[in-house]
Regions:
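P-loop NTP-binding/switch modules centered on Walker-like glycine-rich loops
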Residues: 1-72
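Charged, flexible cofactor/metal-binding loops and thiol motifs
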Residues: 43-130
Length: 130
């Protein structure tokens, strides 16, 4: 796919839950939760140094090819995914977030902020008043 991109000067929009493969096809990765971008950045930054708790959960869910680790417990995002028709107000991930901050996450929608060069996150953990 990279060869096709270069040869024909085209772009791909690769939509997946498999963040492990996304890093190989992408110049940038945008992680979305219930229709909102919650993290955006270069593939290595997003996959090796994720910022948002949901991105961290996606990466932790990637199966490890080492057979010795096949029985390793993987963290699971708590709770049930919300109804996409009736999304939670403010931070959409707050009902399931292990880092939930009452009075912040449930009261204010986090802005997408640049935390590192070209690496953005929408999370109160990285807000100006965090």
């Amino acid at each position: 796919l990279k060869d096709l991109q270069q040869r024909f000067k085209i772009a791909f929009l690769y939509v997946t839950h498999d963040i492990a493969t996304a890093r190989y096809f992408s110049d940038r990765i945008a992680v979305m939760y219930l229709g909102r971008i919650i993290e955006l950045g270069p593939p290595d930054d997003v996959t090796e140094e994720p910022l948002h708790p949901y991105t961290k959960a996606l990466i932790a869910a990637v199966p490890e090819p080492d057979p010795a680790n096949r029985f390793r417990e993987r963290p699971v995002v708590p709770g049930e995914p919300p109804d996409p028709i009736n999304v939670p107000p403010n931070c959409r991930f707050h009902p399931r977030c292990p880092s939930f901050m009452e009075g912040k996450c449930d009261m204010m929608d986090p802005a997408l902020r640049e935390i590192r060069t070209a690496h953005f996150v929408a999370c109160h953990l990285y807000g100006l008043d965090a």
